[in-house]
């Protein structure tokens, strides 16, 4: 498509106001690129943006799990990223200046130049060229973008799992240093919970338990065994501490809490950890929500290691793409709902619990 051609994008102008706007494609220079979006995965962040629970600088084009084909690329960008026009790529949410101490140390989530302000799917449209997210037919890639090549035999829809699976690998294995034989408990059976279970089992965990809550999680818990779980527990029915102890004779070496808007889950994560165990907290609770039932003294008496987890890095993303290509787990057959631009609002409302029916485990926008 030529420079100046008109393309469509979905713009979130305000909470629950998602509209189609037209944008002209920018001229690509030596250091930037343009991606034809084939698929963009949706997660909890997307529906929190949609409802306004996650405050943003309206208006913006959402979408931070983009997979697409390079439509145009400058020569220096081609050399920097190691990709060419026609290659399928996954676009990381963070940008990296590649120069500050954080970026040189691999912590580009904390890039001094970009940080959280320049995440794809969050940048206001009044910053040219406006096409800063995956809810669009084309997405602009700035010079400091981070992209990964996607194998040609991996469908774009499945490839969008590079993001949640990368999170599962980093949160469930890398950060807690999960070892072969470890007992791992994953709280939350959403896409990132299933991915964390798969990653832990893939790293050699001896036993993996996944927990959920009530009918909304029933289908997800039923899938857990296909993604590495040895035990799935509905905490509305059974005590997860008792269930894990019965199966393993003890508590978890590693607990990964990926629940969202579930304040009481943190106390449960602490209860599930063995003395000197590790608890990774990746699910956010919302400002001011607190942690009902949590006593800091338990952390002291059990000498727990409690670690926060923010985002993913290139190492985990590459491992995720390799795992997807391997076919070890049935990610391709995950129950997913794919929609065009016109169907995005209904899908987001469903994921936010504002429509009848159970939200899909994997939501994908295919512009």
From Swiss-Prot:
Enzyme class of the recorded protein, top EC level: oxidoreductase
CDD domains hit by this protein: MDR
Necessary cofactors: Zn(2+)
Gene3D superfamilies: Medium-chain alcohol dehydrogenases, catalytic domain, NAD(P)-binding Rossmann-like Domain
Cofactor binding description: Binds 2 Zn(2+) ions per subunit.
Keyword Metal-binding among record annotations: yes
Domain of life: Bacteria
EC number: 1.1.1.1
Residue sites binding Zn(2+) 1 per the record: 43, 64, 163
Tagged with keyword Protein biosynthesis: no
A GO term for molecular function: zinc ion binding
This protein's UniProt keywords: Metal-binding, NAD, Oxidoreductase, Zinc
Positions contributing to Zn(2+) 2 binding: 97, 100, 103, 111
Reactions catalysed according to its record: a primary alcohol + NAD(+) = an aldehyde + NADH + H(+); a secondary alcohol + NAD(+) = a ketone + NADH + H(+)
Other notes: Was identified as a high-confidence drug target.
UniProt similarity note: Belongs to the zinc-containing alcohol dehydrogenase family.
Protein name per the record: Probable alcohol dehydrogenase adh
Organism: Mycobacterium tuberculosis (strain ATCC 25618 / H37Rv)
